[in-house]
Amino acid sequence: RRYQGVAPGCHLVAAKVLDRRGNGRLQDVLRALQWISFNQNLYGIRIINISVGAAAMDSKAAARLIKAVEQAWDQGFVVVTAAGNMGPAYGSVTAPGSSKKVITVGASDMLDRISSVSGAGPTAECVCKPDLVAPGADVISCANKRNSYAIKSGTSMSTPRVSGAIALLLQKDPFLTNVEVKMLLRESCLD
């Protein structure tokens, strides 16, 4: 293997919500969250990484998505979501990252500055978001062709890095709650 992620020893469980063009529907994300919830114990799922966000979503649909991720959070999952790439304007964090409960990740560039496209808060409910930023520029990631890679940028690249760090944290202390994980991450960030 040429490349490996932040937590190369962790087991991944994938729930596909996008087609080969990168398009998806709200119903597919909601169905995936239900599947994860149902299979939590079978696969030992602790972390839900959601590297998609929806800017062009009506408020009713956004509320359904936020409700679903908050239900997952309330079940004890560590839910990590992308802030979206609609920044840098205030209030540009996309759903479900606008949820006050979940860990919302913005993107930083090669110079450790917040990326110009990274979603920014506060949310419509005056919640400070994102909770943290992680490298999201020029990341080598998998591509949609067999055994191929591509260089990508954005919060969809920074979010899995945080999820990987959380996997390592939970490996060290498996009894941490999602709230404790979020608190530890926020307290360890440099401003």
Predicted segment positions?
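Solvent-exposed, polar/charged alpha-helical surfaces in well-ordered, non-transmembrane soluble domains
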Residues: 31-34, 67-71, 103, 160-167, ...
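Sec/Tat-exported extracytoplasmic proteins
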Residues: 40, 52, 56, 73, ...
